[in-house]
UniProtKB/Swiss-Prot annotation:
The organism of origin for this protein: Rattus norvegicus
Protein name according to UniProt: Tumor necrosis factor ligand superfamily member 4
Alphabetically ordered keywords of this record: Cytokine, Disulfide bond, Glycoprotein, Membrane, Signal-anchor, Transmembrane, Transmembrane helix
Tissue expression as described in the entry: Detected in T-cell lines, but not in a macrophage cell line.
GO molecular function (one): cytokine activity
Cytoplasmic domain ranges by topology: 1-25
Length: 199
């Protein structure tokens, strides 16, 4: 009766280690399955991205224009159109044709203290542009979300000078679209001003 119910030490170790070994094996299988499923999802995602072609490859919207004066309470945005600029200026406003995030950078020096506000959407309040050197210098950069039909323009106010008499040195406005995959309005067809005579 001495040895009944008591197993030799080797058998105890073997029986005790088997369940732990099974759990480790099951855990490894589960982790491998999760990794395989994740890899499969990544491959499917990449394949879908390559197979879906964008509806229209529109150029990145960008503008670099001189700011040379003031007209009707707005800073005058000059037009220096070149092949790399894709945005249009109308009535001292930059017209936004494509949705996305845009970087807007303004710099310049004034001979008097001014206050400048950046406007871009009718239902939004303007962004106050902080000034340097007692309100006579601006170096301002902001990233904001703009959409089709928005108009970017700058209003200026000087306490003792009329808008038309403001003097600006080295004024420049740069607008660059950072995310070019949003909606873009179709480009307007070229309209010729030449009179056409029927044949």
């Amino acid at each position: 009766m001495e040895g009944e119910g008591v197993q030799p030490p080797d058998e105890n170790l073997e029986n005790g280690s088997r369940p732990r070994f099974k759990w480790k094996k099951v855990l490894r299988l589960v982790v491998s399955g999760i990794k395989a499923a994740g890899l499969l999802l990544c491959v499917v995602y990449v394949c879908l991205q390559f197979s879906s072609s964008p509806a229209k490859d529109s150029p990145i919207q960008r503008l670099r224009a001189p700011v040379t004066g003031c007209e009707g309470g707005r800073l005058f945005i000059g037009t220096s159109k070149n092949e790399y600029e894709t945005m249009e200026v109308q009535n001292n406003s930059v017209i936004i044709n494509c949705d996305g995030l845009y970087l807007i950078h303004l710099k310049g020096s004034f001979f008097q203290e001014v206050k400048i506000n950046l406007h871009f959407r009718k239902d939004r309040s303007p962004i106050f542009v902080p000034m340097l050197n007692n309100g006579q210098r601006v170096v301002f950069t902001v990233v904001t979300s703009l959409a089709f039909k928005d108009e970017v323009y700058l209003t200026v106010n000087a306490s003792d000078t009329l808008c038309e008499h403001l003097q600006i040195n080295d004024g420049e406005l740069i607008i660059v679209q950072l995310t070019p995959n949003g909606y873009c309005a179709p480009e307007r067809p070229y309209s010729s001003t030449v009179n056409q005579v029927p044949l």
